[in-house]
Amino acid sequence: MRDPVDTYMNYLVPMVVEQTNRGERAYDIYSRLLKERIIFLTGPVEDGMSTLAVAQLLFLEAENPKKEISMYINSPGGVVTSGLAIYDTMQFIRPAVSTLCIGQAASMGSLLLTAGEKGLRFALPNARIMVHQPSGGFQGQVTDIMLHAQEILSLKKRLNEIYVKHTGQPIEKIEDALERDNFMTANAAQEFGLIDTVIDKRPSDEPAKA
């Protein structure tokens, strides 16, 4: 009987086979796309996903520090500190990182989308982008609750500053936009400055690898 975990993973992650001068070589689809300098950020932003994304960014920088990296984002958001680890690495490495929203980029997903290289931040026409302030909960002694509240306020301030930096919007407009869940179409996100371009087709002169 086949292992149900193996069946599940094989169903979700297709394998591709390439012919090389040494014979056939099989890759899972994401490893093959990584060869083309494409990184996928899909699902909730948490420590495991963040670690993989950071590792891929660092690997691609070491492989070629001058060649652009493409990041495809479809994420509902997640843990702020995990997202900031990816954000800081995107800013730290030498290659330009282009970002493309497919599906959705919500919460920390939207921050990573707008953190791409200026002029290289894209969304497909039916993508949805959502921004809001950080949220969290804590129970315990009053002093501990106050400390955690101060930390969330500090994170809120820092996230607002990042959005200001990448969108060019004044802090007052960012604070107002992030006060509640703020859903945007791709065109609205472009007007707001979260992305640079809404694209519906790959340019005919652009190779299909990126």
From Swiss-Prot:
The keyword Glycosyltransferase does not apply. GO terms for cellular component: cytoplasm; endopeptidase Clp complex. It is an enzyme of class 3 (hydrolase). Pfam families: CLP_protease. GO terms for molecular function: ATP-dependent peptidase activity; ATPase binding; serine-type endopeptidase activity. GO terms for biological process: protein quality control for misfolded or incompletely synthesized proteins. It is found in: Cytoplasm. Keywords: Cytoplasm, Hydrolase, Protease, Serine protease. It catalyses: Hydrolysis of proteins to small peptides in the presence of ATP and magnesium. alpha-casein is the usual test substrate. In the absence of ATP, only oligopeptides shorter than five residues are hydrolyzed (such as succinyl-Leu-Tyr-|-NHMec, and Leu-Tyr-Leu-|-Tyr-Trp, in which cleavage of the -Tyr-|-Leu- and -Tyr-|-Trp bonds also occurs). The active site is at 107 (nucleophile), 132. Its EC number is 3.4.21.92. Cleaves peptides in various proteins in a process that requires ATP hydrolysis. Has a chymotrypsin-like activity. Plays a major role in the degradation of misfolded proteins. Fourteen ClpP subunits assemble into 2 heptameric rings which stack back to back to give a disk-like structure with a central cavity, resembling the structure of eukaryotic proteasomes. PANTHER family: ATP-DEPENDENT CLP PROTEASE PROTEOLYTIC SUBUNIT (PTHR10381:SF70). Belongs to the peptidase S14 family. This is ATP-dependent Clp protease proteolytic subunit. It comes from Azorhizobium caulinodans (strain ATCC 43989 / DSM 5975 / JCM 20966 / LMG 6465 / NBRC 14845 / NCIMB 13405 / ORS 571).
